[in-house]
Amino acid sequence: MNSYFTNPSLSCHLASGQEVLPNVALNSSAYDPVRHFSTYGEAVAQNRIYSSPFYSPQDNVVFSSGRGPYEYGSNAFYQDKDMLSSCRQNAMGHNTQTSIAQDFSSDQSRASVQEQKTSIQIYPWMQRMNSHSGVGYGTDRRRGRQIYSRYQTLELEKEFHFNRYLTRRRRIEIANASCLTERQIKIWFQNRRMKWKKESNLTSTLSGGTGAASDSLAEGKEKEEETEEEQQKE
């Protein structure tokens, strides 16, 4: 019954040279509860002594130091972990080096672009040429033409039909109603009066006689409006 202990093919040794199964006496107290079975008897109890070592020959191979074809020591797993950690560290170092190189190249390109911008010499003809497109290099840029909406032009035309000259109070009211500034309304009325004068001159030349009188009255009203604005500013 004790052939398992004497079989040399099943012997497995630890790294320190000790056997896996210690030499424990059969009359030890550790096997007392295993011996006494009421159903199977003493022979069956002796066979049941091999509780844990019977299933552990393959598990104990892991702790061997010879490293046969199917044996792997505990150091092999730690070596693999060390190799993985070293590979990760090398990859991280490579990534940091590439990011630093990219940042350095981008900084150099920005510095070169700024140097090119500062080295460009601006001439007056460049300012005049690009002033109409809104890309002026100097301070003498022309202001863009004001575009009025349909609602704004309709309100201004109605006001011009009744009053060709506006007071400051009326100009403020129209500016609040049409979402425009006083200066924009003033310029629009000036342009509209010039257009109206040209139209009236054409009609007077065709009909004859009354054109000069209407022009003199319009000029007098414009002068009165300018003097009134100057007085309000003072």
UniProtKB/Swiss-Prot annotation:
InterPro entries tied to this protein: Antp_homeobox (IPR050296), HD (IPR001356), HD_metazoa (IPR020479), Homeobox_Antennapedia_CS (IPR001827), Homeobox_CS (IPR017970), Homeodomain-like_sf (IPR009057)
Motif (Antp-type hexapeptide): 122-127
Any GO BP: anterior/posterior pattern specification
Parts forming coiled coils: none
Compositionally biased region (Basic and acidic residues): 218-234
Tagged with keyword Mitochondrion: no
PROSITE patterns named in the record: ANTENNAPEDIA, HOMEOBOX_1, HOMEOBOX_2
DNA-binding region, residue range(s): 141-200
Residue segments, region Disordered: 200-234
Keywords, comma-separated and alphabetical: Developmental protein, DNA-binding, Homeobox, Nucleus, Transcription, Transcription regulation
An annotated GO cellular component: nucleus
Subcellular locations according to the entry: Nucleus
Record has Protein biosynthesis as a keyword: no
Family: Belongs to the Antp homeobox family.
Function summary: Sequence-specific transcription factor which is part of a developmental regulatory system that provides cells with specific positional identities on the anterior-posterior axis.
PANTHER family documented for this protein: HOMEOBOX PROTEIN HOX (PTHR45659), HOMEOBOX PROTEIN HOX-C6 (PTHR45659:SF1)
Protein name in the entry: Homeobox protein Hox-C6
Organism encoding this protein: Notophthalmus viridescens (Eastern newt)
Gene: HOXC6
